[in-house]
C-alpha cells in the first residue's frame, strides 16, 4: 500500500492552534490576611497560551483545508504545517459544529490536493489507512479495515453516519485522512472509543460523502444551511386519540409552531 500512501500523504497536514486563556486565581488568594503577607502578586489573574494539535487535509490547490471543528474551535491562531516542510497561517472559512467539520484556507503556491473516493460503496472488510499526527510525533500512517459503516446514535455529533475502522487513531489524528487502498479520501478521522485515551481498535471517521456537502456550502457561503420544519410534535398515543375523539391512535400531534417555522 506504499503507492496509496505516497499519493495521499502530501495533502495531509498538521494543524497547530493557540489560544489565550485567563487563569482565575483561587479565592483564598484574595483573602486580606493572605494579601497582608504576600501582597496581590498571587491574586492577579494570569493570561496563558494554550496550544493543541490536530490534522487536516488539503482538498484543493486553492488552499482549502478540511479538518474537524473541535481541532480549531476557539483558536486565536492556526498554523498549518505541510509534509514538505512549508508552513502557513490559516484563516477559518467556516465551521459546522453539527458535523464537527471546519474549512480553513492557506495562501501558498503549488499545493498538493487529495483525491476524493466514494464512501457510499464501502464494504465491511475493505482496507483502510489512517494518516495524521498522533500525539504530535509527526505524520504517521496506520493500517486497518472497515469495521462498520453508518455508525450513529453515539452522541458525538448531531449528524452521525460514521465509518468505523480498527486502523489506529489517537489524539492528534483528528481531522486527518482515512483513505482507501488506492490513496483516495473516504473519511475524516474524528473520534475514538477508548477508556485509556489511546487507540483501542474503534476509530470513527466522517464519510467523505457527508463531508463534501458540508465543505461545499462552507466554501460557497461561509456556513451550512439545513431545512427544518420548526414545529413541536408529540407521538400520538391511545390516550391522546381518545381525548380528541379519534378513531385511530397513530400519527403525530402538532403541539406548536416555532417562530419562523
Predicted segments with their positions:
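Serine-dependent protease modules
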Residues: 1-260
